[in-house]
A protein has these predicted regions:
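Cationic, low-complexity basic patches in intrinsically disordered or flexible, solvent-exposed regions
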Residues: 211
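A polyanion-binding, active-site-adjacent surface
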Residues: 2-203
Length: 227
C-alpha cells in the first residue's frame, strides 16, 4: 500500500465503503420502516462514538442522536451540535445502523445482530486517527468489552478510570437513565468532568503524522477496541 504523509487511507476508498454500508439490505425483512443505514465520520475523526441503533426520529431525519437522547448526550459531553456533527472530528457508529422497530412497551427493539460483525471492523480500519472511543449503552459495552463483565451496568461504568485514556463507557442517554443518574451522582460529579477534559485534549490536538493503527491499540483486557 502506498505511504501517505497523513497516515490516513485516502478518502475515496472510505467513501466507497460508506456507500456500500448505506446500500445494505441484509436486515430489510426485519425492519418495520425499511432499511436506512446511518453512519457518520471521516478518516480524520479523532473521537468515535459507538452506541445502540437509530430511533424512529433518527430514521426519519438521517442524523444520529437527533433527538432528546442526543440532547442529553451532548450535554454530558459539553459539545454543541456543530462540533458533535463535524464528521472530520467525530465519527458515530451504532451497533446497528437501521431503526429496529419498537417493542410492546414502546421502547426500541435491540439492534439487529447482523450489523456490527459485518461492518464495524471494516469501518474502524479507516478510523486510524481515533484517540478516544465512547461506548454508549449496554449493547456497545457488551460487544466491545468482550468476556465476562460485572453483574450490573453500574459496576462497569463505575470503573471508568480503568478504561481511560483511550476508552470511556457511558449509560445510554435515554429518558430511562434519569433515575440511574439520580442514584449515581458520581457519574455527573466525577466521571463527566474527567471525560470532558480528555475530549478537549482529543478534539483540539494536532493530527499525528502516523496515527496508531486500530489493531495496535490496547484499551482494556478482553476489549475488542484496537483489534
Amino acid at each position: 500500500m502506498p505511504h501517505h504523509p497523513s497516515g490516513l487511507i485516502p478518502d475515496p476508498a472510505f467513501s466507497r465503503l460508506v456507500a456500500e454500508v448505506r446500500a445494505c439490505r441484509i436486515c430489510a425483512p426485519h425492519l418495520p420502516l425499511g432499511p436506512r443505514p446511518i453512519v457518520r465520520g471521516r478518516p480524520s475523526a479523532r473521537l468515535l462514538i459507538i452506541s445502540q441503533a437509530p430511533g424512529k426520529r433518527v430514521h426519519e431525519t438521517g442524523l444520529p442522536f437527533n433527538d432528546r437522547s442526543g440532547d442529553r448526550l451532548r450535554g454530558w459531553l459539553a459539545l454543541d451540535r456543530e462540533t458533535f456533527y463535524d464528521e472530520a472530528r467525530v465519527a458515530i457508529l451504532g451497533m446497528a445502523f437501521c431503526y429496529p422497530g419498537s417493542d410492546t412497551k414502546g421502547g426500541d427493539l435491540p439492534p439487529r445482530p447482523e450489523c456490527a460483525p459485518r461492518w464495524h471492523d471494516r469501518l474502524r480500519t479507516y478510523f486510524s486517527a481515533i484517540e478516544l472511543t465512547l461506548l454508549v449503552g449496554s449493547y456497545a459495552i457488551d460487544y466491545y468489552l468482550s468476556g465476562p463483565r460485572a453483574r450490573s451496568m453500574t459496576e462497569v461504568i463505575v470503573r471508568w478510570r480503568d478504561f481511560l485514556p483511550q476508552l470511556f463507557v457511558l449509560p445510554h442517554p435515554s429518558w430511562r437513565t434519569t433515575r440511574w443518574l439520580r442514584d449515581n451522582p458520581w457519574f455527573e460529579n466525577e466521571a463527566l468532568p474527567e471525560l470532558r477534559a480528555r475530549m478537549a485534549q482529543v478534539l483540539s490536538a494536532t493530527p499525528q503524522v502516523e496515527p496508531v493503527p486500530p489493531q495496535k491499540i490496547s484499551a482494556a483486557p478482553g476489549s475488542r477496541i484496537g483489534r
